[in-house]
Amino acid sequence: MSDRQAALDMALKQIEKQFGKGSIMKLGEQAERRISTISSGSLALDVALGVGGYPRGRIIEIYGPESSGKTTVSLHAIAEVQRQGGQAAFIDAEHAMDPVYAQKLGVNIDELLLSQPDTGEQGLEIAEALVRSGAVDIIVIDSVAALVPKAEIEGDMGDSHVGLQARLMSQALRKLSGAINKSKTIAIFINQIREKVGVMFGNPETTPGGRALKFYSTVRLEVRRAEQLKQGNDIVGNKTKVKVVKNKVAPPFRVAEVDIMYGEGISREGEILDMASELDIVQKSGAWYSYNEERLGQGRENSKQFLKENTDLREEIAFFVRDHHGIGEDSGVEDTEDATLQD
């Protein structure tokens, strides 16, 4: 053994003695090299994310204009975690959570942990306590813009508080990022959009809360309404584009197009039909959609209704779509230990 190797081994032993086993290791010694994920609740978004869902132990930012579907997207993720037997928490800083709508999206409101904090510090401390417990699989903070620092709440209207929220978020994320990774919790931060004053060239839009969240996020999703969906003269929903603007675990800039129906959330039938048509799993001839010579319906809406009534057929088509994109069934919710070394 060379002197360099002996010196390195001694240093590694000293580090493990001081900071505990697993504090330093070779990358190949990690028990899990494959990224563990939980489905977003949308097949189109799972494909756009590239790994079949949201990566566990990572920070996700979902931002977009008002009423674009940000909370709907995050509630579908909560419903998916609960469906797999996991624990979910919702920090409602906006004080705008609608339990009836959440229930329609499949959220079990009897099991969902809800906090409506008075200040930004309180909301982030509650989030930290839940993450450090290691018992929460997903936590949603709605929204970053509503995490108002205590000094601003206790001050007078018109008082200037420059950079307070950015400093609060920066400090919170420094503390949270390590705990989120160890506990394998998915932390979703919903954010709003603001416009910079005086921008002549480039995009004037920005997100509040400083730059820290942009850096700490593994995935950033931009949610925007594309067009209205109508049945006759009635507007029944929106076609929504979810763009993956940052992705550390797969190629970014993929776009998922989903139908968000009022009172129902993301239409599973709509996204399966669109994706299967693109892959020629479902054949389209004129206005008719068919699968294995079985006609699904005339027109997109009728075909969606047929799939809604025939769930076995819908899931069979979804299986072939997942298989084509190399996305298996969700990795699910597991009991994970902090130690990542093999015994």
Curated annotation (Swiss-Prot):
GO molecular function annotation: ATP binding; ATP hydrolysis activity; ATP-dependent DNA damage sensor activity; damaged DNA binding; single-stranded DNA binding
Any single GO CC term annotated in Swiss-Prot or TrEMBL for this entry: cytosol
Keywords, sorted A to Z: ATP-binding, Cytoplasm, DNA damage, DNA recombination, DNA repair, DNA-binding, Nucleotide-binding, SOS response
Family to which the UniProt record says this protein belongs: Belongs to the RecA family.
PANTHER family: MITOCHONDRIAL DNA REPAIR PROTEIN RECA HOMOLOG-RELATED, RECA
Predominant cellular place of this UniProt entry's protein: cytoplasm
BP terms from Gene Ontology: DNA recombination; DNA repair; SOS response
InterPro entries (UniProt xref): AAA+_ATPase, DNA_recomb/repair_RecA, DNA_recomb/repair_RecA_CS, P-loop_NTPase, RecA-like_C, RecA-like_N, RecA_ATP-bd, RecA_C_sf
Domain of life: Bacteria
CDD domains: RecA
Residues where ATP binds: G64, P65, E66, S67, S68, G69, K70, T71
Any single Pfam family the record assigns to this protein: RecA_C
Entry annotated with the keyword DNA-binding: yes
HAMAP family with a match to the protein in the record: RecA
Gene3D superfamilies reported for this sequence: P-loop containing nucleotide triphosphate hydrolases (3.40.50.300)
Localization (cell): Cytoplasm
This protein's record includes keyword DNA repair: yes
Protein name per the record: Protein RecA
PROSITE patterns: RECA_1, RECA_2, RECA_3
Described purpose of this protein according to its UniProt entry: Can catalyze the hydrolysis of ATP in the presence of single-stranded DNA, the ATP-dependent uptake of single-stranded DNA by duplex DNA, and the ATP-dependent hybridization of homologous single-stranded DNAs. It interacts with LexA causing its activation and leading to its autocatalytic cleavage.
